[in-house]
């Protein structure tokens, strides 16, 4: 579906129908069975390929909940709720491929100040619900998934921070997979906080200026325990970074899809990974 939509989007006359094709619930209900068959085939191709070429760390900018709702004549609350349920599905698909790291961009620090207060309150309630579900989810415990929430968490209400603590404590001993949620997160703010940490340590005499290098900064980021992302996926047709993992994505590969996040399918994930596998990573060379 997404490939067909991408072709149609090249022509102005077909842009409206193409967007509908990529995101309509009606359209997806028609092709869902075909997509499941294609998904099985794509998964088989991926698992039979050289596993060392698969990404170890996938990061996703989950964009398009509101546009999904608007395009389907729904309230934005339903769009965010659908986005939450989609994340649970994607987690299963990623675990199914044995990808050890998944990081998602759930809420930016800019969203907190720029979105309507009632919408942010809905998001907070969904985060609390989702984090509490994670703490009890058999899938999380069977696969030994460690939950990690990063960002300027002091910006969040106490009730959200409490739910974060519950999910992290329930999974803190797990090491097989790591699921990182970026909440109240901003890439620039993360770098600023790392630099402040370096400056403080230097002022106290514990750090020489000559010892400040890439590793010194990386070790002070919110994501210091994670490898850099191999593949960054952004949904909903926007082709920008939006202040996400600015330091960590220096050599990541990017995949953009026109599909809104709630419409993202298993096949879309496999296409993104197949596209990644087909590339030759250069790491700046």
Predicted ranges, named:
Residues 1-285:
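Flexible, compositionally biased loop and terminal segments
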């Amino acid at each position: 579906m997404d490939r067909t939509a991408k072709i149609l989007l090249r022509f102005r006359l077909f842009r409206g129908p193409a967007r509908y094709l990529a995101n309509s619930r009606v359209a997806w209900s028609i092709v869902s069975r075909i997509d499941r068959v294609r998904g099985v085939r794509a998964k088989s191709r991926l698992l039979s390929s050289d596993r060392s070429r698969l990404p170890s760390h996938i990061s996703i900018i989950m964009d398009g909940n509101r546009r999904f709702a608007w395009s389907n004549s729904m309230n934005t609350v339903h769009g965010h709720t659908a986005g939450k349920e989609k994340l649970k599905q994607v987690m299963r698909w990623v675990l199914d491929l044995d990808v050890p790291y998944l990081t998602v961009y759930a809420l930016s620090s800019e969203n907190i100040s720029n979105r309507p207060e009632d919408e942010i309150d809905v998001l907070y309630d969904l985060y609390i619900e989702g984090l509490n579900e994670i703490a009890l989810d058999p899938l999380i415990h069977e696969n030994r998934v460690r939950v990690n929430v990063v960002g300027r968490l002091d910006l969040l209400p106490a009730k959200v921070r409490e739910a974060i603590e519950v999910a992290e404590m329930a999974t803190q001993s797990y090491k097989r997979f790591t699921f990182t949620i970026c909440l109240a997160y901003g890439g620039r703010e993360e770098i600023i906080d790392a630099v402040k940490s370096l400056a403080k340590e230097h002022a106290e005499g514990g750090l020489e200026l000559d010892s400040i290098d890439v590793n010194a900064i990386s070790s002070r980021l919110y994501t210091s325990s994670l490898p850099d992302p191999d593949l960054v996926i952004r949904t909903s047709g926007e082709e920008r970074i939006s202040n996400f993992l600015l330091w960590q994505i220096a050599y990541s590969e990017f995949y953009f899809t026109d599909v809104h996040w709630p419409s993202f399918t298993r096949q879309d994930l496999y296409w993104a990974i197949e596209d990644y596998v087909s590339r030759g990573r250069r790491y700046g060379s």
